[in-house]
Amino acid sequence: IVASLVGSEMCIRDRLVCWPPHISAPIHGHEGEKCWARVQTGELKICNYVEINRDPLSLEKIQEFECPPGFLDGPADIHSVENLSDSFATSLHIYAKPYEECELFDTERGTVTKAKMDYHSIDSVLCNK
């Protein structure tokens, strides 16, 4: 997954994500912030969840969408995203507030971990990897 930060202000963050074929993002949250996601190209599957319990971890899938270009999802607290196609897909994500880490929910292990946000580029400048 290749993500580019295309804008960030005090109250909003824009992230453009390029999804290789058949790649998925794990179930994740946005540090309590809302996320709106718009499919730009390709077809993505978006599943939205609600947290029932943290210990032991229990999530309930409340929505599942197969999303063509132009589909807008949100506001979402916890979701997963998957590229269903044999081609690349892109999506634009808008967050209510900037954040540097997100929570990853592993329902098989019953764990919640934190992951630092990683970008391919920020404001059109490539990041050093």
Residue ranges and their predicted role:
Residues 21, 32-51:
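Glycine- and acidic-residue-biased ligand/ion/polar-headgroup-sensing regions
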Residues 74-94, 98:
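Ligand-binding loop in jelly-roll beta-barrel domains
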Residues 15-30, 74-76:
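Conserved short histidine dyad/triad with adjacent acidic residue
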Residues 29-31, 84-85:
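Short glycine/proline-enriched turns and hinge-like loops at secondary-structure junctions
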Residues 1-7, 11-12:
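Single conserved hydrophobic/aromatic residue that forms the stacking wall/gate
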Residues 36, 51-79, 116-120:
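Short acidic-glycine-tyrosine-enriched beta hairpin
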Residues 110-129:
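Long hydrophobic alpha-helical segments typical of transmembrane helices together
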Residues 24-26, 45, 69-70, 76-81, ...:
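Histidine-centered metal-chelating micro-motifs
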